[in-house]
Amino acid sequence: MSTHRTTVYRHAELARLLHPASVAVIGASTRPGSFGERVLDNLANYTGGVYPVNARYERIGDRICYPSITSVPQPPDCAVITVARDAVEQVVLDCAKAGVGGVIV
């Protein structure tokens, strides 16, 4: 007998991830061609809040860059994680602690 359970989420429970009012880019970068730089570039015309997160920078372009997801002034609805795979698990845990609505890895 299988003990596997499937959890089905309603659209309302996924709204913050699917229709975010704010997005954090964890691993944001100014390095040309890096994943963090490309994600930020793709969000250039996004009308919601964009929070670059990387302890190496104080600013990226005209945006304040936060040293960690827990230092972002309000929990973003979505976080795009662009860090090295060895750091992903801890970043996801930090996102949960910070109250992020959902993550994209």
Give the predicted meaning of each segment.
Residues 1-105:
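Catalytic-core regions of core metabolic enzymes
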